[in-house]
């Protein structure tokens, strides 16, 4: 981490976000977001970056993943209670934009068997892709539960036209250490994507859904 982000600052901010929030118990599980503002970056000219990093603890426990599976995958999913759909169920949506949109809204991410993944644009049209939820490949030599966990704990940095971005790095029921570890991973990964690394970072904050932002950098 170097001297750039001090451990003390990080723990202090995390404590404030996690425990400052105990005064008010919310009805839902608040997410903790890392907010990044950039500098010396021209989104028009500079390459827009994107990248994914896997965190140690799942930032969003309620994150839902649906398997678009062949027979074997659907049977496996059924056995471990993972939401799944087979090719017949997808065909029934009949490329109806509204229904595909509804499906994309219902789940946070999708996994698909090899035999299905190539057919998805043909069966469903561009809906999942438009929603930024095109399925990741699920092969038969991967453990489905482990793969779903991996999807749940992976976050994506995507530079758009503006100079600030935000990603979920945890939630308020985490321990200080879990959250610090996740933030540390996320920040280091993000900085590695930037052209001039830390020289492109104007400020970093963490913030729970309803809480006040705490500055890290």
From Swiss-Prot:
Coiled coil: none annotated. Pfam families: Ribosomal_L1 (PF00687). Its main location: cytoplasm. Gene3D superfamilies: 3.30.190.20, 3.40.50.790. Keywords: Acetylation, Cytoplasm, Isopeptide bond, Phosphoprotein, Ribonucleoprotein, Ribosomal protein, Ubl conjugation. PROSITE patterns: RIBOSOMAL_L1. SUPFAM superfamilies: Ribosomal protein L1. GO terms for molecular function: RNA binding; structural constituent of ribosome. The keyword Glycosyltransferase does not apply. GO terms for biological process: translation. Component of the large ribosomal subunit. Component of the large ribosomal subunit. The ribosome is a large ribonucleoprotein complex responsible for the synthesis of proteins in the cell. Belongs to the universal ribosomal protein uL1 family. This is Large ribosomal subunit protein uL1.
